[in-house]
Design a protein with these regions (language model features):
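Periplasmic alpha-helical coiled-coil/stalk elements that build and connect Gram-negative outer-membrane
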Residues: 142-258, 369, 373, 383, ...
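Hydrophobic, well-ordered secondary-structure elements that form the walls
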Residues: 262, 296, 324, 341, ...
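Terminal intrinsically disordered/low-complexity segments used for targeting and assembly
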Residues: 1-43, 91-96, 110, 134, ...
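Short flexible linkers and secondary-structure junctions
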Residues: 1-154, 294-298, 317, 328-338, ...
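Sec/SRP-type N-terminal targeting helices
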Residues: 49-50, 66, 106, 120-148, ...
Length: 449
């Protein structure tokens, strides 16, 4: 299996150090609407209910396997009406000779008592089966945590995609209002013969382009809402009140070291880990099946051929039957079971190793993207500041009557463009932060049980 000391990032991935994500990591964005949405998803999403049902199923299977390691006891009451064949093994009982105690050919046999059985697990076959079932139960618990992590991160991703689109739509509508003012101004100038028709047509084309972008953005919002609704199991009208909210980025650092912590904090890795542990126990159980098995059966009660004699002292019966079985010829069944268990174990180990490498890659990719976005953000803020200076100057000229209203408004368009670029960067930052949170396990910590 992969050495945990290899679970480290490359040295060129430099991020501020931070703590591991908390269990309710999404509260860092200070958005009550997001909090309610994720709580709704965890309570209502079908995928969550399926994962929880699988845990219950695995727990029941573990209880069933454990029961096989304990003393089995039963209480028995039986009435058996027999008609004995005179030509069979019990032919003597088919005769009616009271002097000999025979009242055949029909008898009403009665049995009352208690029986017990115990299997001695000398070679650990049943212990290994229990450990395999424990591994599967723990794997299902880790899978439930993984499903919950995927649900929360996907819900947050979709939510912030919708919020980004809503903010983009708001900027586009602001640009549309400016363009409508500009087109009206150009129309007025053209009607007085102060401006050529092609210039007016050009401005109208830009206005139509903005309207197309608004319609497209609005359609994207509706589509994302439908995807979100299906994901969390919401009804037809339960997301209609999803309102625009401020997009707040937050600082997210990288833990100082990964190593064993990442292996214990990723539910998908714990899922694979428990599959490996279960497969190891299955190999042990398959090996133990080659050895002799010892059990003992006991019965204590009353047995009589005649119901009228059942409660008499002479009807008492006790059986004690120790048993030893050794598989000799089984058609290759035990060897096949062992080979299958070993193959499953080998496959589980390789899948786990690959999952560990993939986990490190996911952390690294999110870290690289956040590094790049952290470098882009101050440059974009500087660009926005420069165009705002130009827009403020134009507004001042307009107030002094040195610039027309339409021209002053048009200068605002580059500001909107740069605000949209900064909005895209912030949306990408949040998306990569959520990917990093998911790659770091989203606050999951293995109990180690």
């Amino acid at each position: 299996m992969v050495d945990p000391n290899r679970v480290q990032l490359a040295k060129d991935i430099q991020m501020a150090q931070g703590a591991w994500p908390q269990a309710r990591w999404w509260v860092r964005y200070q958005d009550p609407q997001l909090d309610r949405l994720i709580d709704f998803a965890l309570a209502r999403a079908p995928a969550i209910h399926v994962a929880r049902a699988r845990v219950e199923q695995a727990q029941a299977q573990l209880a069933a396997v454990k029961s096989g390691t304990r003393l089995q006891a039963i209480a028995l009451g039986l009435v058996n009406r027999d008609h004995v064949s005179s030509n069979g093994f019990l032919g003597a009982f088919a005769h009616d000779e009271p002097a000999l105690g025979l009242t055949g050919p029909s008898y009403s046999e009665g049995i009352v008592g208690a029986g017990a059985r115990y299997d001695f697990d000398i070679w650990g076959e049943r212990r290994s089966a229990v450990q395999a079932a424990v591994g599967m139960r723990n794997a299902q618990q880790a899978e439930r945590a993984e499903v919950e992590l995927v649900m929360t991160t996907n819900t947050a991703q979709l939510y912030f995609q919708i919020q980004t689109l809503l903010h983009q739509e708001m900027l586009l509508e602001e640009a549309q209002a400016i363009m409508e003012t500009t087109v009206a101004s150009h129309d007025a100038r053209a009607s007085r013969g102060l401006e050529a028709g092609p210039r007016v047509a050009e401005q109208r084309a830009l206005l139509l382009q903005l309207e197309q972008q608004i319609n497209l953005t609005h359609a994207q919002v509706r589509a994302q809402r439908e995807i979100l609704r299906a994901l969390i199991g919401a009804g037809a009208d339960e997301l209609s009140e999803l309102a625009i909210a401020p997009i707040r980025t937050s600082q997210l650092g990288m833990p100082a070291t990964l190593s064993y912590d990442l292996l214990a904090r990723r539910p998908d890795l714990q899922l694979m880990h428990w599959y490996v542990q279960s497969s190891i126990s299955q190999v042990s159980a398959a090996k133990a099946a080659f050895y002799p098995s010892l059990d003992i059966k006991a019965f204590l009660g009353l047995d009589s051929l005649h119901l009228s004699d059942l409660l008499q002292h002479g009807s008492r019966q006790m059986n004690l039957v120790p048993g030893l079985t050794l598989p000799i010829f089984d058609g290759g069944r035990l060897n096949a079971n062992l080979q299958r268990a070993r193959a499953v174990n080998s496959d589980s180990i390789e899948e786990y190793n690959q999952a560990v490498l993939d986990a490190v890659r996911e952390v690294a990719m999110a870290g690289v993207q956040l590094q790049a976005l952290a470098q882009q953000e101050p440059m974009q803020v500087a660009k926005l500041h420069e165009v705002e200076v130009v827009a403020d100057s134009a507004a001042a000229h307009y107030k002094r009557g040195l610039l027309s209203r339409a021209d002053a408004a048009t200068v605002r368009l580059p500001v909107i463009t740069q605000e949209a670029e900064l909005l895209t960067i912030h949306g990408n930052q949040i998306a990569q932060q959520i990917r990093l949170i998911q790659a770091l396990g989203g606050g999951f910590v293995s109990s180690g049980t």
